[in-house]
């Protein structure tokens, strides 16, 4: 009898441990599958505001606070725009002073917590940039997809699509440049975004199903006069662009791809986000399996460039070694495998999805050179 009881207790313990591991894997996978738009990814540190004065802001000294370039600074109920580090401004050893360009809304005071975001602009193109725009609804398979349309004289449209941790406001970073060069721009909100249809299962599929909303945007553009389209995607938006270029029924109208911090291995990205939530390394494979079970995502035999061997249109990739969410090495592999089609522009000291922010002028010059033959 004692043996039977001991065996039953051991079995119960094993079952309990297994259930706990499954639950832990499921929770860890939420870091990617339930990443809310417009909120910081777990890889992005919170910074403390130490004070503001005369066009300057003092932040906790951190590698993030030392990044070069121009960023949004978001807190709970506030948004500001910060410029480069002011190395000559007086500061203590544990702080950093950056240029404070503007406070878009809310207030920033000592003790506030905030994070850097690639979203420099908030609102809409008319309010943030002074560009005439129209709010349009794009018919999608799950319902109407809200988008901003900024008109331009050319018949090649740029369709911009954001990725993890951001919103369609991210497209405004390059919208002024595109408008100066007379490109019509369509900035898309897709399933799971504010105002867009809900995802059927409530989960982010990291571009693997969301690309169909981008396909709907391509169809809308062609119906409304676009002869060709260039897809400009950030993060999982870049994944969507690659999928649409390969599978859209109108892929012959896609003349170029701009891929910023592309997620080329969803498993690697999921592991990175789960690890940033302090998931123990031993549980990371469970997070991947949980994600597969919840979403039906395929095994990551796509970690390298092989799925894109059939790429038939030119692509410009903006990426760099400081991206801890979507490793740069996969972009390097893609560029090395397809030098005939893929140009890699390497950006240093920039986090995921923020290649423009690190050096807007250089980014836009590379973009101009790429787009010129496609005009």
Regions found by a protein language model. Give the residues of each.
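N-terminal targeting or regulatory segments adjacent to alpha/beta-hydrolase or S9 domains
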Residues: 1-130
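Short beta-strand element of the alpha/beta-hydrolase
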Residues: 155-163
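Conserved alpha/beta-hydrolase
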Residues: 178-198
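Alpha/beta-hydrolase active-site loop
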Residues: 203-224, 230
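Hydrolase active-site cap/lid region
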Residues: 246-300
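Short beta-strand/loop motif that positions the catalytic acidic residue
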Residues: 310-312, 317-319, 323
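Conserved alpha/beta-hydrolase "acid-adjacent" motif
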Residues: 324-330
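Catalytic histidine-centered segment of alpha/beta-hydrolase-like enzymes
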Residues: 350-364
């Amino acid at each position: 009898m004692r043996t039977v009881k001991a065996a039953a207790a051991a079995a119960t313990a094993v079952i309990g441990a297994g259930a706990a591991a499954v639950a832990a894997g499921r929770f860890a996978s939420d870091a990617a599958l339930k990443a809310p738009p417009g909120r910081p990814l777990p890889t992005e540190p919170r910074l403390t505001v130490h004070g503001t004065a005369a066009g300057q802001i003092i932040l906790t000294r951190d590698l993030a606070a030392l990044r070069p370039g121009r960023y949004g600074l978001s807190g709970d109920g506030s948004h500001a725009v910060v410029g480069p580090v002011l190395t000559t401004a007086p500061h203590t050893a544990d702080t950093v002073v950056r240029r404070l360009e503007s406070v878009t809304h809310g207030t920033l005071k000592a003790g506030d917590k905030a994070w850097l975001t690639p979203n420099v602009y908030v609102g809409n193109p008319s309010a943030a940039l002074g560009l005439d725009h129209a709010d349009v609804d794009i018919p999608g398979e799950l319902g109407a997809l809200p988008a901003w349309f900024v008109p331009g004289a050319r018949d090649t449209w740029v369709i911009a699509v954001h990725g993890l941790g951001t919103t369609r406001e991210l497209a405004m970073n390059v919208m002024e440049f595109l408008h100066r060069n007379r490109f019509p721009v369509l900035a898309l909100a897709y399933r799971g975004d504010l105002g867009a249809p809900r995802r059927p299962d409530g989960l982010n599929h990291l571009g693997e199903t969301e690309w169909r909303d981008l396909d709907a945007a391509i169809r809308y553009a062609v119906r409304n006069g676009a002869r060709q389209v260039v897809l400009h995607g950030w993060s999982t938006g870049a994944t969507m662009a690659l999928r649409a270029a390969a599978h859209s029924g109108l892929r012959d109208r896609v003349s170029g791809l701009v891929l910023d911090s592309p997620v080329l291995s969803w498993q690697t990205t999921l592991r990175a986000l789960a690890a940033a939530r302090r998931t123990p390394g031993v549980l990371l494979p469970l997070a991947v399996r949980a994600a597969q079970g919840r979403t039906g995502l395929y095994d990551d035999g796509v970690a390298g460039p092989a799925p894109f061997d059939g790429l038939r249109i030119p692509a410009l990739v903006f990426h760099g070694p400081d991206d801890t969410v979507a490793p740069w090495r996969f972009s390097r592999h893609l560029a090395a495998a397809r030098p005939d089609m893929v140009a890699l522009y390497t950006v240093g000291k920039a986090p995921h999805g923020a290649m423009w922010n690190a050096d807007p002028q250089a980014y836009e010059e590379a973009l101009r050179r790429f787009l010129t033959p496609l005009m």
